């Protein structure tokens, strides 16, 4: 008989009960168990820096926001319409002694991306770090089931938004600034039921590498993170109860990761600790070996 523990981060089994949410990108407060977003340690590596994080209300985005706040950064939190999750994230930021603002809206729209950057600079006076993290996914068993509407929505949210918001941010970024893009393990190994999503994540890898070369002479570093199965609101809002029950079992570590286990990658890439890295990806994926 297998011993069952409570904390997924110290367990090799899957502790996620069957569950499903109807709307994307999902509500964190409705998840069981709640994802673990807060890291314990901080070293003020981002002191006096201003960071903009898209999809920052919950999941990996929330964990990144909180990790940045603990490291001394002030944060602008861009999110779609998950107001309750966003308000909680802002409260946690303020509890950690940092300042934050909430900017709701759809980053697949170019005009809104410009607004997000303008609001960030208006409130904080500058922008040092951009984290492109917003994303959506809609599983389909067959390519024929992917509608034109779904295809456009997935690409507009996952990759078009990165072009739009980065274009808006670049006039404010300077030497020493950092851009960190969220990709996925699916960019490297594909996914039979997330064909359009995996395609956008592959595009993000190419975007990151190309942009890093383009901006290297300006002293702006561009890197990315390609997580494996992480317990975020996108999971119960994407998959059936049965799929959620199995989520994360297939990686060598035998469990899904917590958002806080990914956040340190973003802190590293945003800070001077990674000053000799650009065009690179980190892979917190539970031990899956991939060809990078």
Model-identified regions with their sequence ranges:
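Short C-terminal tail/terminal secondary-structure segment
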Residues: 6, 11-16, 31, 38, ...
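Active-site helix of classical SDR
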Residues: 166, 200, 208
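Conserved mid-core segment of classical short-chain dehydrogenase/reductases
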Residues: 10, 114, 122, 137-152, ...
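Alpha-helical segment proximal to the catalytic Tyr-Lys
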Residues: 171, 213-217, 275
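C-terminal substrate-recognition "lid" of short-chain dehydrogenase/reductases
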Residues: 124, 163, 172, 255-284, ...
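Catalytic Tyr-X3-Lys loop
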Residues: 144-163, 180, 204, 253
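A glycine/serine/threonine-rich, flexible loop-to-helix segment
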Residues: 193, 217, 229-251, 291-292
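Residue(s) in the substrate-gating loop at a strand-loop-helix junction
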Residues: 184
């Amino acid at each position: 008989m297998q011993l069952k523990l409570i904390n997924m981060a110290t367990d090799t089994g899957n502790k996620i009960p069957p569950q499903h949410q109807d709307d994307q990108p999902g509500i964190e407060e409705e998840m069981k168990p709640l994802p673990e977003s807060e890291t314990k340690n901080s070293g003020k590596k981002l002191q006096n820096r201003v960071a903009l994080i898209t999809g920052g209300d919950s999941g990996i985005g929330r964990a990144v926001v909180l990790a940045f706040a603990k490291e001394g950064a002030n944060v602008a939190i861009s999110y779609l319409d998950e107001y309750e999750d966003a308000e909680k994230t802002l409260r946690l930021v303020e509890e950690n002694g940092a300042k934050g603002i909430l900017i709701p809206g759809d980053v697949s729209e170019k005009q809104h991306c410009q607004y997000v950057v303008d609001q960030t600079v208006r409130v904080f006076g500058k922008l040092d770090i951009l984290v492109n993290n917003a994303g959506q996914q809609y599983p389909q068993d067959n390519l024929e089931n992917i509608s034109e509407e779904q295809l456009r929505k997935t690409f507009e949210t996952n990759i078009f938004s990165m072009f739009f918001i980065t274009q808006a941010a670049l006039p404010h970024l300077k030497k020493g600034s950092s851009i960190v893009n969220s990709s996925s393990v699916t960019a490297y190994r594909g996914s039979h039921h997330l064909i359009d999503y995996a395609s956008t994540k592959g595009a993000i890898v190419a975007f990151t590498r190309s942009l890093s070369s383009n901006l290297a002479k300006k002293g702006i570093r561009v890197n990315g993170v390609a997580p494996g199965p992480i317990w975020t609101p996108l999971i119960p809002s994407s998959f059936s109860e049965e799929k959620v029950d199995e989520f994360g079992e297939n990686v060598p570590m035998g469990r899904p990761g917590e958002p806080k286990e990914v956040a340190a990658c973003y802190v590293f890439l945003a800070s001077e600790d990674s000053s000799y890295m650009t065009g690179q990806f980190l892979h917190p994926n539970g031990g899956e070996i991939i060809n990078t």
